[in-house]
Amino acid sequence: MKFFALFIYRPVATILISLAITLCGILGFRLLPVAPLPQVDFPVIMVSASLPGASPETMASSVATPLERSLGRIAGVNEMTSSSSLGSTRIILEFNFDRDINGAARDVQAAINAAQSLLPSGMPSRPTYRKANPSDAPIMILTLTSDTYSQGELYDFASTQLAQTIAQIDGVGDVDVGGSSLPAVRVDLNPQALFNQGVSLDAVRTAISDANVRKPQGALEDSAHRWQVQTNDELKTAADYQPLIVHYQNGAAVRLGDVATVSDSVQDVRNAGMTNAKPAILLMIRKLPEANIIQTVDSIRARLPELQQTIPAAIDLQIAQDRSPTIRASLEEVEQTLVISVALVILVVFLFLRSGRATLIPAVAVPVSLIGTFAAMYLCGFSLNNLSLMALTIATGFVVDDAIVVLENISRHLEAGMKPLQAALQGSREVGFTVLSMSLSLVAVFLPLLLMGGLPGRLLREFAVTLSVAIGISLAVSLTLTPMMCGWLLKSGKPHQPTRNRGFGRLLVAVQGGYGKSLKWVLRHSRLTGLVVLGTIALSVWLYISIPKTFFPEQDTGVLMGGIQADQSISFQAMRGKLQDFMKIIREDPAVDNVTGFTGGSRVNSGMMFITLKPRDQRHETAQQVIDRLRKKLANEPGANLFLMAVQDIRVGGRQSNASYQYTLLSDDLSALREWEPKIRKALAALPELADVNSDQQDNGAEMDLVYDRDTMSRLGISVQDANNLLNNAFGQRQISTIYQPLNQYKVVMEVDPAYTQDVSALDKMFVINSEGKPIPLAYFAKWQPANAPLSVNHQGLSAASTISFNLPTGRSLSEASDAINRTMTQLGVPSSVRGSFAGTAQVFQQTMNAQVILILAAIATVYIVLGMLYESYVHPLTILSTLPSAGVGALLALEIFDAPFSLIALIGIMLLIGIVKKNAIMMVDFALEAQRTGNLAPEEAIFQACLLRFRPIMMTTLAALFGALPLVLSGGDGSELRQPLGITIVGGLVMSQLLTLYTTPVVYLFFDRLRLRFSRHSSQPVSE
């Protein structure tokens, strides 16, 4: 009593405390960063290494394996995958959440240094690493186009100046420049001219390398002066190299221009980038794992005007893609939903109380509680994101509950004629324990979420803490500010205030009367009601088992990613044409705003596209509907497939794939993996639960298999090294020298002119100069025949791996797909030497599925423990928890009706329902126990009176929570995919629970009371506490 009096009789102090909470919240709100979701990115580091011309198998065995053995010893590595293709190896290290990425980067560098001695000596540079996940969609894509500058010049400008500047911006993890390569002097050799002049390819390479030397020359010095020695030992341009003497034939000089075409070109001619089907250089910007996407994008945009000033007028720099507008629009939508929820909740209170003064009290309590939460969010390092703002939206119904319970009880005493201050003291004292029980038991629901590990735990932690803080502040406000405002604002009324019998009040009285009559009938037929309770338990279990499940709702972020996979023997020229054709088809779609893409490099038969859709208010279709429409249009393109997927704010794993979900096959026997992967992929592609099934195992690339006749080579004076150098010089785009410039270093690249390598007859023109100086054609000592070879070799850990990627058809869930895959693997009889497991998001889904039931049971057990401690009883918590099955039935039925799978967001809704619906039972049980103690009423009469007396606050709190969640169900626009499952779950659970628990709770209460009496030896008092 003294506690409540302290605040009721000191209104100024109470108001100032509330103002202080509000001001702190406003300050925290202004300082909070903005993000789509809580920070849940795994620390990922990518290691890259190159050896131009080396086959995928060579890269895997000589580069990837030594690096993997060294990197695999680093502590905290969650997963290590690698992919080796023509001349390139990429290793992805995914670390545990608790691993600091900067410390991990130091360990990665140390591991690379340790493996350096085991790597091939011909590598043009040491392996490098980047602190970014290559599988993440870029947060921004910039394009450079020009009518006067070449693609190589644009690439040089982008790589040397723009990428360097952007990479220094806080939050930027990686700037990947694509669409071409650095400028280079290309030496395209004429094999016929070389043969006629008797010049070997190795002699040309040596001559070029020896002619371009950057070495210190020292200085001259006398007693008074010092002169730096400078020579023309460097060659910079194609014009400098063209007159270079590479050989003497019969005393006549053979110059490089006589046997080759020398040009200022690019390092790798097999690269292409486009924007809207036009040539372009792309700057794909990815953020650091721990960086905030909105802050990073804002920082980049702030630097763009400065960068624009450094760009020549003939170069056009444009933002082709920016992921932040849809994120901002989504947050604006949820903020509007929050405001609507607050307004609806206040409206509910007004309809029940029909008093402006009374309505003002919760209208003040709710904003104070919600705004004050922002201060705690800032101190906890949280952000304003979809989940934290949804937590505040749902909290609207919670925080008003406490104020409603206190306000309604004080109003009841005022209507009975009690003076305001006395009613405030008496009313708050009566329900103080009830409000405390409701709040503590509600917070207890979220304790298991706080202890949950992995990505789901990280994802839900902000939601749980934000909601718990809001409830805690609401508890303090409802026990301090609310009683004070009631005591000073409200007036005493007559015992039977006529306003209760007008309009909505008359309807409420009629409903309450009808409820009383029906409750008497239910109490007389308690066995039937007991069967209903048992039925809801069984039905909720069955619905949970049968409902389709997924990890996270599919979001419409307004950005699509597309992976092109063409025939494995396709040429670069044909692949570039496919990219352009796909772009034209997509660009014609009315929902598409911009398309960018690139192809080439080490994977000639693949490409990547990024598609920006128009804003939601300018298109009528969702991202998935656009994908379905484009899939039909793109299906007729011969020789290539384009796999589209909507970019999500959550993507797990470092694998780059052409679909949203992955299933990985592992084996220590490479031949077994290559035998079974096509069978498994074909079987999975036939499943109706899967779409866009594809694999990263590509074993049918065209290869020309050369077999040396070593005896003949020995007789002719030719070594295997000579023959291999010939092939590398001719076909490997071999980097044979370096040109040093002030801002960058460029390469001299040598290969046979592509005009002579259009078919296998190019091998007939190749020759080696033997030890006697005679040209020996390759055909004299080697035979060749076409064969198949892998385009890439993939590892996970140290095992050979193949990842099958898939999307979900419209109307299918991830649980259905997972079950179908497991069933298919069993039916195929895959041997134990080939192991299958889900990867990435699908793997996290499997882990979450196993933890969901445990999490729900842990929440129920925690609530039981808290309630048992509060009531000092083993029985009463069971009565209160009996309300949960009906809520579960309602929630799961609502998801089924709306055709929404059970996701992590729906799980949050179930957890919230555990906290919400038990409030009704707490109010009933609390008043019934008090009536038995103080009024000496029988249990039947006590629970009956409790139900009638608490009918109005129960209806108010339930409707307030329901209307607080209703805007989530009805919301559209950006981000509605996240909000709707939460709203559907809560509204469905509340409706069903309200219909049943008003009747089942009294029956369960009486059942346990009779059970207690039957086993109790002390029956002198009606209730033993």
Curated annotation (Swiss-Prot):
It is a multi-pass membrane protein. The chain crosses the membrane at residues 15-35, 333-353, 360-380, 387-407, 431-451, 469-489, 528-548, 851-871, 875-895, 897-917, 953-973, 984-1004. The keyword Coiled coil does not apply. It is found in: Cell inner membrane. Keywords: Cell inner membrane, Cell membrane, Membrane, Transmembrane, Transmembrane helix, Transport. The keyword DNA damage does not apply. Disulfide bonds: none annotated. GO terms for molecular function: xenobiotic transmembrane transporter activity. SUPFAM superfamilies: Multidrug efflux transporter AcrB pore domain, PN1, PN2, PC1 and PC2 subdomains, Multidrug efflux transporter AcrB TolC docking domain, DN and DC subdomains, Multidrug efflux transporter AcrB transmembrane domain. One of its GO terms (cellular component) is plasma membrane. InterPro entries: AcrB_DN_DC_subdom, Acrflvin-R, Multidrug-R_MdtC. Belongs to the resistance-nodulation-cell division (RND) (TC 2.A.6) family. MdtC subfamily. Part of a tripartite efflux system composed of MdtA, MdtB and MdtC. MdtC forms a heteromultimer with MdtB. This is Multidrug resistance protein MdtC. The lineage of its organism: Bacteria, Pseudomonadati, Pseudomonadota, Gammaproteobacteria, Enterobacterales. The gene is mdtC.
